[in-house]
Amino acid sequence: TRKTTPGLRYLEKEAVKIGGGMNHRIGLFDMNLLKDNHVDFAGGIPAALTRARDYCKEKGKHLRIEIETRNEDEIREALATGIPDRIMLDNFTPERTRKAVELIRGWEKENGKHIEIESSGGITLDTIRDYALCGVDFVSVGALTHSVKSLDMSFKAVKE
């Protein structure tokens, strides 16, 4: 959502839907997404997840919580809290993604809680299939909104 054109977010998101894509978020008001900066400022993944959960409870907000992870250690930290509803695998290769999916699915079996998995970062329309075949629930392709090429059109008026 941060990579949409200012003032045009809803139109760009609608265009993705019309083209067959799905939007899982419009902004931070409909799902908490804890990115690396949030994690760093909070003092780590467990602290960021705990603060997000506690804030939602305190404010009476029923928002799902997604955490961005950059490696297996961060995935393990997130899983150890039992808090996230979704784990984002940021800039993972397909091979690292497969290993991460195995780790998360194994945790699910042991703990009885389903956690959605999202691949994101550097994924293109040419590589999306490689990530989808790893068993993730969602694949984000930012190019659908931030790298769209404009259609060259013109309109001719005919005087009758």
Where do the PLM segments sit?
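Cys/His-rich Zn2+-binding cysteine-cluster or related metal-binding knuckle/ribbon modules and their
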Residues: 125
